[in-house]
């Protein structure tokens, strides 16, 4: 039934109580939609003109419907006046190609040990296959995405990472493990990113960077996203994962945690494997930056919009120690 007919019928009644949900065929979804839209308004007003750095990875990349949902969300953010910068991983694709050449991977604290042969595969997969697929999806959704890697225009300069560990806890002697061509962000060319934002493009960045003597490094995408968020004074860093968020020792989701809480989760071994660089990145962004950091479940369709524009949100937000 059309809205004007509903109102007309109501005017013929002795007691005008207004149109009811039943008069719309009992479809409460219409009303819920308008409620959600009105709920978005204060967040849109708050973040218009701000920069969001979004680390994209996990199931949101491997599931095509989730990938298309993510692309639409990125375009919507841009249309709302927010400047999204996408940094992507691609671990599953890298693993798949390494398996084809019978190459095994070793991970230490969530970082892939990278020799010369592995580096070639990483650069080929991330900068070629994965990066271009993401830009194509965003462009198909109506955006203007441009694919980059850390090497382009010296966007991100990296330095070599060395992992220290104690072989024997009794003698307290630390040893250095060579991670190969694994780097960490050192400097960011913010001028290029500001230029891209002003040109109405959406940058999509692969975490392959160069360092001293033009050596190429494989850099963890979480660390790259964090470095960009700090360098650009981004309002938010958002990391998509394959889990619901950060959990405590009992597996309960933590909707908000302080920097101290995050540090304790790492020290106590509650956070492990790939969650370690994610939390470390969030800690650094909150300590050194101006915004908040979020770890959210990329398996949920339109999870970005749920986290950013609804009262309850989803996942885990990392805030300063004064929460």
Swiss-Prot record:
UniProt keyword Transferase present: yes
Main location: cytoplasm
Keyword terms: Amino-acid biosynthesis, Arginine biosynthesis, ATP-binding, Cytoplasm, Kinase, Nucleotide-binding, Transferase
GO CC annotation: cytoplasm
MF-aspect GO terms: acetylglutamate kinase activity; ATP binding
Similarity comment: Belongs to the acetylglutamate kinase family. ArgB subfamily.
Name of this protein: Acetylglutamate kinase
């Amino acid at each position: 039934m059309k809205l004007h007919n509903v109102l007309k019928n109501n005017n013929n009644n002795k007691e005008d109580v207004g149109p009811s949900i039943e008069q719309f065929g009992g479809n409460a979804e219409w009303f819920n939609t308008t409620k959600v839209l009105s709920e978005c308004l204060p967040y849109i007003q708050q973040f218009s003109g701000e920069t969001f750095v979004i680390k994209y990875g996990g199931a949101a990349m491997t599931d095509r419907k989730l990938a298309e949902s993510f692309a639409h969300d990125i375009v919507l953010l841009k249309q709302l006046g927010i400047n999204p910068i996408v940094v992507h991983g691609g671990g599953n694709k890298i693993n798949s190609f390494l398996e084809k050449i019978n190459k095994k991977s070793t991970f230490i604290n969530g970082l892939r040990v990278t020799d010369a042969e592995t580096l070639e595969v990483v650069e080929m997969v991330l900068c070629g296959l994965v990066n271009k697929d993401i830009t194509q999806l965003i462009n198909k959704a109506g955006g203007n995405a441009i694919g980059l890697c850390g090497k382009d225009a010296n966007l991100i300069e990296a330095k070599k990472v060395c992992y220290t560990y104690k072989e024997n806890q009794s003698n307290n002697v630390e040893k250095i493990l060579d991670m190969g061509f694994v780097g960490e962000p050192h400097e960011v060319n913010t001028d290029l990113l500001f230029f891209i934002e002003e040109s109405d493009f959406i940058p999509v960045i692969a975490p392959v960077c160069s360092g001293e003597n033009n050596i190429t490094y494989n850099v963890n995408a979480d660390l790259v996203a964090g470095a960009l968020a700090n360098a650009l004074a981004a309002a938010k860093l958002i990391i998509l994962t394959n889990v619901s968020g950060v959990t405590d020792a009992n597996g309960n989701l933590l909707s908000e945690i302080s920097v101290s809480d995050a540090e304790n989760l790492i020290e106590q071994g509650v956070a492990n494997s790939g969650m370690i660089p994610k939390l470390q990145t969030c800690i650094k962004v909150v300590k050194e930056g101006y915004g908040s950091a979020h770890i959210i479940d990329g398996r949920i369709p339109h999870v970005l919009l749920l986290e950013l524009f609804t009262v309850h949100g989803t996942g885990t937000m990392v805030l300063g120690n004064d929460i």
